[in-house]
UniProtKB/Swiss-Prot annotation:
Gene Ontology biological-process entries: endothelial cell differentiation; endothelial cell migration; negative regulation of apoptotic process; regulation of BMP signaling pathway
Annotated positions of the Phosphoserine modification: S163
Keyword Secreted part of the UniProt annotation: yes
Residues of the Kazal-like domain: 46-98
The protein's name: Follistatin-related protein 1
InterPro entries, alphabetized: EF-hand-dom_pair, EF-hand_FSTL1, EF_hand_dom, Fol_N, Follistatin/Osteonectin_EGF, Kazal_dom, Kazal_dom_sf, Prot_Inhib_GrowthFact_Antg
Source organism superkingdom: Eukaryota
Lineage of producing organism: Eukaryota, Metazoa, Chordata, Craniata, Vertebrata
Length: 306
């Protein structure tokens, strides 16, 4: 019998202590604001501090976070943000809608201006590192001489560097060529070739897709600022990275040119597959390029008039 009374007494003491701690915490934390996902706690020294909420109330009011994750309520979202140290906001009320997965092949592999400029920056950095100042009794190598050396090493004898020769030149430096935008290595290899083409286009004054030494020198001149080219379509101009669609194919603006996929449409796009042949797709891309050329000619004429 006495054991039963002892147990009841211990429970009563524990309850009293808990009540006292709660009153003490309420008093210490009365003027402390911790923000969403955090709550005030009392340290061993009796000082207030803000910690992530230990447990949220289980009421159901689902919300979708900006990270694409569904939470039971607002409290759980802010608690997760606190625990992970990340910024998560309420995107909308309710469960997150399932996002349609986009196949990697849904977008064409392209070299954006940022990719082109990054490759160019790395090449210039590599070449500048090979500059040797003149010594007391020896002659060094300046930037133009270093470029001349590489130009002659990779030129096949026609005094021009085509895209394959330019690519071989760039491949001499691991850091310069190591552009990895895509998870697939084959796509990254294709990207390097496309960015080399984009570099050639920068200074290819006679549009023969080959660079003379003077064009090569201009392309990699550290003081040269590559222009930001836009794509034209239906009297509108689009910035680098802009996209448009035709049936199930996607076209992307990259370095001033429209680049499109050439997928065979099926399912809901079956009609497109039946009506649009490969030849028609080619014509569509050519039409995009004509819009681009027309816009550039108009721009040049306007510049001359000014």
């Amino acid at each position: 019998m006495w054991k039963r009374w002892l147990a009841l007494a211990l429970v009563a003491v524990a309850w009293v202590r808990a009540e006292e701690e709660l009153r003490s915490k309420s008093k210490i934390c009365a003027n402390v604001f911790c923000g969403a996902g955090r709550e005030c706690a009392v340290t061993e020294k009796g000082e207030p501090t803000c910690l992530c909420i230990e447990q949220c109330k289980p009421h159901k009011r689902p919300v979708c976070g900006s990270n694409g994750k569904t939470y039971l309520n607002h409290c759980e979202l802010h608690r997760d943000a606190c625990l992970t140290g990340s910024k998560i906001q309420v995107d909308y009320d309710g469960h997150c809608k399932e996002k349609k997965s986009v196949s990697p092949s849904a977008s064409p592999v392209v070299c954006y201006q940022s990719n082109r400029d990054e490759l160019r920056r790395r090449i210039i950095q590599w070449l500048e590192a090979e500059i040797i100042p003149d010594g007391w009794f020896s002659r060094g190598s300046n930037y133009s001489e270093i470029l001349d050396k590489y130009f002659k090493n990779f030129d096949n004898g026609d005094s021009r560097l085509d895209s394959s020769e330019f690519l071989k030149f760039v491949e001499q430096n691991e850091t310069a060529i190591n552009i990895t935008t895509y998870p697939d290595q084959e796509n990254n290899k294709l990207l390097r070739g496309l960015c080399v083409d984009a570099l050639i286009e920068l200074s290819d004054e006679n549009a023969d897709w080959k660079l003379s030494f003077q064009e090569f020198l201009k392309c990699l001149n550290p003081s040269f600022n590559p222009p930001e080219k836009k794509c034209a379509l239906e009297d509108e101009t689009y910035a680098d990275g802009a996209e448009t669609e035709v049936d199930c194919n996607r076209c992307v603006c990259a370095c001033g040119n429209w680049v499109c996929t050439a997928m065979t449409c099926d399912g809901k796009n079956q009609k497109g597959a039946q009506t649009q042949t490969e030849e028609e797709m080619t014509r569509y891309v050519q039409e995009l390029q004509k819009h681009q050329e027309t816009a550039e000619k108009t721009k040049r004429v306007s510049t001359k008039e000014i």
